[in-house]
Amino acid sequence: MSNIKLIVGLANPGEKYAQTRHNAGAWYVQELARVCGATLVADSKYFGLTARVTLHGKDVRLLIPSTFMNLSGKSVGAMANFFRIEADEILVAHDELDMEPGVAKFKLGGGHGGHNGLKDIIASLANNKGFYRLRIGIGHPGDKSQVSNYVLGKAPGTEQAAIEDVIDEAVRSTEVLFNQDMAKAMNRLHAYKA
């Protein structure tokens, strides 16, 4: 049974960024909310879109920060502080350059790997890196100088379909996480390739 009380999907706000690779974490939270029959609503107190869902009897908050990516910690910190949620009770879904589209993995702890959203969340949690992550593969452009344009661009059709397929599997694996445990959820998700 999971101890997670807050699930966060990282994104940049606005229509301009809605369909960009950098928003893959938000796509996961949007799909999770849809499956749970919840509606994400703007809440200025938490600087984001929020919903409250029940996953296998557990009360869980969903959050998509409406700050820009590099200020995600403002939103996560506000909600974690208000509800007294510890770092190891948080799951942050984010785009991952070092994995191909169609692959996603759960992970506990670690650094930010250059991801500005994770960097700001770590800072907002008093440098506590001990939160769970859902890393959603978006692939790498091959050239480090192209990363910014790449993550802020839209994936071509086949890559987008693979990302959406693995997000669907990540939502199913999240249900396993809450119904059973992280090890079983990891085994299921890590074996999947869209």
UniProtKB/Swiss-Prot annotation:
This protein's record includes keyword Oxidoreductase: no
Record: residues binding tRNA: 17, 68, 70, 116
Keyword field: Cytoplasm, Hydrolase, RNA-binding, tRNA-binding
GO cellular component: cytoplasm
Ranges annotated as spanning the membrane: none
Catalytic activity: an N-acyl-L-alpha-aminoacyl-tRNA + H2O = an N-acyl-L-amino acid + a tRNA + H(+)
SUBUNIT field: Monomer.
UniProt protein name: Peptidyl-tRNA hydrolase
Organism in which the protein naturally occurs: Shewanella woodyi (strain ATCC 51908 / MS32)
